[in-house]
Amino acid sequence: MNNKTILVTGARGQLGKTLEHCWSASGLAADNELVLYDIEELDLTSSAEVQKQLNSINPHAIVNTAAYTAVDQAEQEANAALAVNATAVANLAGWATDRACRIVHISTDFVFDGKSNTPYTPEDS
């Protein structure tokens, strides 16, 4: 992989920081660019902002580690949780799909127990 731009969202979170550290240690940084965005640099819930910022950096791949992580507050702040964990993902996926950009979305393990034999749906509880 040479001369590629990789975008990491949620860059100030635990996983984003770890990815940055691993990137630096991997040797990939010599020939590729890692762009680190957190909420201050990019509001993922704004489709217009996602379009503008991603068009300017034109990443070859996106690693989305951004998430609403206040599990205990998610029910009281359902709109905020939905915006970050669903709308933002849709904005990134829409941009990536239009450009054949690879996207890796990392989700939480706090939602279900993982014992289902079929994919979970929004109606599952």
Task: Name the predicted role of every residue range.
Residues 16, 71-72, 112-114:
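Glycine/Thr-rich phosphate-binding loops of Rossmann-like dinucleotide-binding domains
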Residues 5, 33, 58-60, 102:
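Structural signature of beta-strand start/N-cap positions in the alpha/beta core
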Residues 26-52:
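Adenosine-cofactor binding site in Rossmann-like domains, unifying the SAM/SAH pocket
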Residues 76, 83, 87-91, 98, ...:
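Catalytic helix-loop patch of NAD(P)-dependent Rossmann-fold dehydrogenases
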Residues 18, 22-26, 91-99:
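Alpha-helical structural signal in soluble globular domains
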